[in-house]
Amino acid sequence: MVFSVRQCGHVGRTEEVLLTFKIFLVIICLHVVLVTSLEEDTDNSSLSPPPAKLSVVSFAPSSNGTPEVETTSLNDVTLSLLPSNETEKTKITIVKTFNASGVKPQRNICNLSSICNDSAFFRGEIMFQYDKESTVPQNQHITNGTLTGVLSLSELKRSELNKTLQTLSETYFIMCATAEAQSTLNCTFTIKLNNTMNACAVIAALERVKIRPMEHCCCSVRIPCPSSPEELEKLQCDLQDPIVCLADHPRGPPFSSSQSIPVVPRATVLSQVPKATSFAEPPDYSPVTHNVPSPIGEIQPLSPQPSAPIASSPAIDMPPQSETISSPMPQTHVSGTPPPVKASFSSPTVSAPANVNTTSAPPVQTDIVNTSSISDLENQVLQMEKALSLGSLEPNLAGEMINQVSRLLHSPPDMLAPLAQRLLKVVDDIGLQLNFSNTTISLTSPSLALAVIRVNASSFNTTTFVAQDPANLQVSLETQAPENSIGTITLPSSLMNNLPAHDMELASRVQFNFFETPALFQDPSLENLSLISYVISSSVANLTVRNLTRNVTVTLKHINPSQDELTVRCVFWDLGRNGGRGGWSDNGCSVKDRRLNETICTCSHLTSFGVLLDLSRTSVLPAQMMALTFITYIGCGLSSIFLSVTLVTYIAFEKIRRDYPSKILIQLCAALLLLNLVFLLDSWIALYKMQGLCISVAVFLHYFLLVSFTWMGLEAFHMYLALVKVFNTYIRKYILKFCIVGWGVPAVVVTIILTISPDNYGLGSYGKFPNGSPDDFCWINNNAVFYITVVGYFCVIFLLNVSMFIVVLVQLCRIKKKKQLGAQRKTSIQDLRSIAGLTFLLGITWGFAFFAWGPVNVTFMYLFAIFNTLQGFFIFIFYCVAKENVRKQWRRYLCCGKLRLAENSDWSKTATNGLKKQTVNQGVSSSSNSLQSSSNSTNSTTLLVNNDCSVHASGNGNASTERNGVSFSVQNGDVCLHDFTGKQHMFNEKEDSCNGKGRMALRRTSKRGSLHFIEQM
């Protein structure tokens, strides 16, 4: 009550009392609130007696996966003491989140099961009691003697507890308080376990400990929900009833790093319960059985131990269980004194399941994911490789390995990269060696799924592998892809139609793999590219399946919706890239359809002539490949026509085919003609999808390509003999030996390849037309064969031809410099004509293939396609149209009227029509300006005359003339090389030849008894 005594506002004594009372009430309320808050804070941790020294040890996973230890000593802290006695040494702290009114605080409630996905949090306490005067704790078996005497007894206890929790959990947080007076160590810990990890394993490892599942936690609306045990320590969480294992459950003390991990038999998982896993009591001494609505499979632990009964307890809220049969991870021996047995896959003792449709590998946490070094990862991979080397693999052990690989996929990328290829091989080998009785089997884990189906190669049906729900990965084999899948791969029914007979017997199973994370597929060479989908793969009994009559279709959902303006590529993992480390390649893969959330891929190729020497063996854009294809086929068609004309000309007219260069040219034209014809027929024959016919066409294409290369090299070798070995050189059956090399060596190479494996050749798709139809082509399928027998073979020929080309050019320059003043000089056009003709004759233009790389790839592909497909056309121009003696033969026999030449018009002349009569016999005698050469094997000369005509005299006195430096004799066919390849010795001759003075040179030919007069070019 307030009284106003005065108007001036003075307050009476009663008013002062009331004001004081109000202030006192406010202080009491604040005190109550503060005390309540302190009580709730103290309930969140395990506290030791007042005189105790409290040590808080926090383990947080560091960046490299190794727990970092932080120790804080708290002195003179008043804490509530956990009641303890000699008989009961372990208590569970119940963390309360209810206020004084009994109502749960209505703040942001986090459902941990929705956060953890495949894990669960547990809270537990344990109290160790030890004898202060003993160097070894009473209830522990210390096998690592190095710790004794170095650490204090409490530190030793804490160290062993740390190792146990580190081994059994994904992550954990621990806080310990030491009571020296009572010789006790009280520890409270929060651990994160995999949702299929049996919590009794922790109870077995930690003697007399109780574990409580954590479910709901309340936190401030400004704070995100927790994801680690450290964050949970700061919050108020509900604890469910403790998990109780029966009294006769195998117990064991905490163990050191040298001991094996104590694990108990798995509890039965009832998949009928959609969101809960119940711990039921399995029968003693029996394999653990996972009950599913469909046929049941029995799975036996690796080292069978008497199964302890597990009492029922409230269900743990976990993600929905797969309707597949689960198998446990490797379990080591558990007893009161556990022997040092290592958990490995090398010596499994597993019983085969009686009826198995699909098997799901549960993600049991028995190994450390965040290892301290790459050596730990390598040891785990090595254990799996050793187990696979033993042969057949049972489903439960295979499931354990799949789960092990799944956990390793979450290791740091820099540590995982060196082992990526080995892990991929482990996954493939698991599918190859998996032993199962039914038609199909599947193994799933959080990040990896594998499915294997038994097939009959002769009656294979269209099969679709489907992966669904990345949060709870499930796979299935369907006849068609569902709409809600995250990845599918469809194999056509014609998948194995083109397999060889011996491979048909091996193709008894098809394996599918799905990787939820691309950890094993890191390509450092990618620039401005990133993987936006999951990874899916398929293989047929580890065989190389090519020659598909229908494409394989792959549909992959994007992890994040892609932007419309970005370019999406379909790629595959090429194990040969990046020095054998593997890398992404889009060779042969194209986008069939692109949507906002998914991409449909298919594989095919377009074929251009450049694919024969495409060193990178990669494809370009469809529009460019279409243009290259048109250029290729038009060029090959023109070359075939003009090569045929060249062959008919040189074969029909005897006078122009007598010399060696002409005979070699005939062989080269024949090889190029056959190469172009087979290439033109290849794509047409590929449409029939006949394996034997396709292999035959590919073999002939390869053979004629090598023959063409070889005759180009023989052209260069012939020029070398003419320039360097002019004198004292005689080769018996010269052209016959050239033919044996030119046609025989490629035949040997192709025969060796066929002997090794005919499957090195076959049908392949090398691109796609803009309308989506594939362009199939019969060619070399094996990259090693291609690079050795095509690229390597061509490199040798190309280097020889380039060297010879340079030598010829240098020699021509020297000849021109030696000419006397006033002598007739060639024009620049003539020089360019000679160089161009030599370029196409020696196949120098094939060298464009070496520059078809990087940003100039397309440019050189165009140059390659234009010049090499038209090689036959250019040979016709330079060696038929540009040669006057060939033109005269055409005019004589093919023309009529004024264009027709008379029989002997300006072609064949005797030695008296401009030259003094002279006798040519065995040997040649000349004046002091002449050059004579003789040997035991040959005694013939060739006379080169710098004139517009030439006279060739044989032993019988017959002679012939020609222009442009190509000469031949009438009877024996002895010839010289083309004039631009001759090594000439000039001398003056005071005789007229064809109305002019000439300079003459002598050169030896390969036979006896003939003298040739050839004009200077």
Curated annotation (Swiss-Prot):
SUPFAM superfamilies: Family A G protein-coupled receptor-like (SSF81321). Residues 301-366, 918-939 are annotated as: Disordered. Residues 38-627, 689-693, 759-789, 856-857 are extracellular. The keyword Glycoprotein applies. Keywords: Cell membrane, Disease variant, Disulfide bond, G-protein coupled receptor, Glycoprotein, Membrane, Phosphoprotein, Receptor, Signal, Transducer, Transmembrane, Transmembrane helix. Epididymis-specific expression (at protein level). Both subunits are associated with apical membranes of efferent ductule and proximal epididymal duct epithelia. Mainly expressed in the nonciliated principal cells of the proximal excurrent ducts. Specifically over-expressed in Ewing sarcomas but also up-regulated in a number of carcinomas derived from prostate, kidney or lung. Proteolytically cleaved into 2 subunits, an extracellular subunit and a seven-transmembrane subunit. Highly glycosylated. It holds the Pfam family GPS. It is found in: Apical cell membrane. It is a multi-pass membrane protein. Residues 308-320 have a biased composition (Low complexity). Residues 649-667, 715-737, 811-834, 879-1017 are cytoplasmic. Forms a heterodimer of 2 chains generated by proteolytic processing that remain associated through non-covalent interactions mediated by the GAIN-B domain. In the inactivated receptor, the Stachel sequence (also named stalk) is embedded in the GAIN-B domain, where it adopts a beta-strand conformation. On activation, the Stachel moves into the 7 transmembrane region and adopts a twisted hook-shaped configuration that forms contacts within the receptor, leading to coupling of a G-alpha protein, which activates signaling. One of its GO terms (cellular component) is extracellular exosome. Disulfide bonds join 570-601, 589-603, 694-778. Changing residue 679 to A: Decreased activation by dehydroepiandrosterone. The Stachel sequence (also named stalk) in the C-terminal part of the extracellular domain (ECD) functions as a tethered agonist. In the inactivated receptor, the Stachel sequence (also named stalk) is embedded in the GAIN-B domain, where it adopts a beta-strand conformation. On activation, the Stachel moves into the 7 transmembrane region and adopts a twisted hook-shaped configuration that forms contacts within the receptor, leading to coupling of a G-alpha protein, which activates signaling. PANTHER family: ADHESION G-PROTEIN COUPLED RECEPTOR, ADHESION G-PROTEIN COUPLED RECEPTOR G2. Adhesion G-protein coupled receptor (aGPCR) for steroid hormones, such as dehydroepiandrosterone (DHEA; also named 3beta-hydroxyandrost-5-en-17-one) and androstenedione. Involved in a signal transduction pathway controlling epididymal function and male fertility. Ligand binding causes a conformation change that triggers signaling via guanine nucleotide-binding proteins (G proteins) and modulates the activity of downstream effectors, such as adenylate cyclase. ADGRG2 is coupled to G(s) G proteins and mediates activation of adenylate cyclase activity. Belongs to the G-protein coupled receptor 2 family. Adhesion G-protein coupled receptor (ADGR) subfamily. It is linked to Congenital bilateral aplasia of the vas deferens, X-linked: A disease characterized by bilateral absence of vas deferens, obstructive azoospermia, and infertility. This is Adhesion G-protein coupled receptor G2. The lineage of its organism: Eukaryota, Metazoa, Chordata, Craniata, Vertebrata.
